[in-house]
Amino acid sequence: MLDLFNKTSQVQGRISAWLASNNLPHRPLGFDYQGVETLQIKPEDWPSIAVALYVNGFNYLRCQCGYDVYPGGPLASVYYLTKVDDNVDQPEEVCIKIFVPRENPKIPSIFWVWKTADYQERETYDMLGIVYESHPNLKRILMPESWLGWPLRKDYITPDFYELQDAY
């Protein structure tokens, strides 16, 4: 599994400094091209950090998605959180990345913190097979229930027996 916690740390931003001051384990990954601070969180630490971020004002889950890091490698779940407040022209944002092994990809669901995670976690489950533990309705949302495998994994092979039926 991709373990970035033991490598040299990146530049620490404001949110990373706040998490560190509260003894919340994370690893800063720097900033994206828009200046959004990116942090890596371990799956087991995610529920407590999610609640801490919510209490600190990150009241909106703007986006949750997942991706296959590389063939045979770990899977990633990504969360973009935003502080939505009155009279703010430039809301504060943070990007959280959680890496899990593809053999047993489990992450605690944050549906109980941000309800907008409902369909987004289901879609990531449907496409990549990341299991969001304690999600109230984790089942396929885009693919038929009978679909085999996880279509967005880089090692996915399309089964021969699926056909387009009544597609027109």
Swiss-Prot record:
UniProt keywords, alphabetically: Chloroplast, Membrane, NAD, NADP, Plastid, Plastoquinone, Quinone, Thylakoid, Translocase, Transport
Location of the protein in the cell: Plastid, Chloroplast thylakoid membrane
GO biological process assignments: photosynthesis, light reaction
Membrane topology, as annotated: Peripheral membrane protein
Top-rank lineage group of the source organism: Eukaryota
EC number: 7.1.1.-
PROSITE patterns: COMPLEX1_30K
CC terms in the record's Gene Ontology section: chloroplast thylakoid membrane
GO molecular function: NADH dehydrogenase (ubiquinone) activity; quinone binding
Described purpose of this protein according to its UniProt entry: NDH shuttles electrons from NAD(P)H:plastoquinone, via FMN and iron-sulfur (Fe-S) centers, to quinones in the photosynthetic chain and possibly in a chloroplast respiratory chain. The immediate electron acceptor for the enzyme in this species is believed to be plastoquinone. Couples the redox reaction to proton translocation, and thus conserves the redox energy in a proton gradient.
NCBIfam families registered for this protein in UniProt: PRK12494.1
Family named by the database record: Belongs to the complex I 30 kDa subunit family.
Subunit annotation: NDH is composed of at least 16 different subunits, 5 of which are encoded in the nucleus.
Protein name: NAD(P)H-quinone oxidoreductase subunit J, chloroplastic
Organism: Chaetosphaeridium globosum (Charophycean green alga)
